[in-house]
Amino acid sequence: MKTYRRQLREKIIQALYTLELRDVDTDSATNWLLTKEMADDPNAMKFFNHLMKSIIDHREEIDRHIAKHTFNWDMNRIAIIDKNILRMALAEILYCEDIPPKVSINEAIEIAKKFNSTEKSSKFVNGILDAIFNDLKAEGRIQKCGRGLIDHTESKMQKSESNR
């Protein structure tokens, strides 16, 4: 079974862009984007639908996190593509328990490079996501399950130092 996650993330960005610019429902914005191969893959569709639903259902919360870290920017001034890349990555970090945060951030950076809405999109996306991730981690909001999903290096080092 082929993994389509990068392509699905790109399709999600395209769907979010369509939703932002046109008065259409989610199905209309997404159905034409998916290849038959993707649509026929239950795992691909599960990932796609879960991530789309998470972005839409939690958009206000996600946007609050973005606004908190873009205090010099009005949300309406952030490029639509960049804003939706941030939304997608944050939804993944917060609501996809099986995806490591570093993967979500890296995928967002790579997609920002590909879509390249501005010259500095990838750096902007990286900086904002890194700041939000650090806040969420400090607040204990990152809930991941499975090995390697959260970098526990700092906490291991702190435990090691306290045992001396």
Swiss-Prot record:
Keyword RNA-binding annotated: yes
Keyword check for DNA repair: no
One of the record's GO molecular function terms: RNA binding
NCBIfam families per the UniProt record, alphabetical: nusB (TIGR01951)
Function: Involved in transcription antitermination. Required for transcription of ribosomal RNA (rRNA) genes. Binds specifically to the boxA antiterminator sequence of the ribosomal RNA (rrn) operons.
HAMAP family hit by this protein: NusB (MF_00073)
Protein family per UniProt: Belongs to the NusB family.
Name by which UniProt lists this protein: Transcription antitermination protein NusB
Organism: Chlorobaculum parvum (strain DSM 263 / NCIMB 8327)
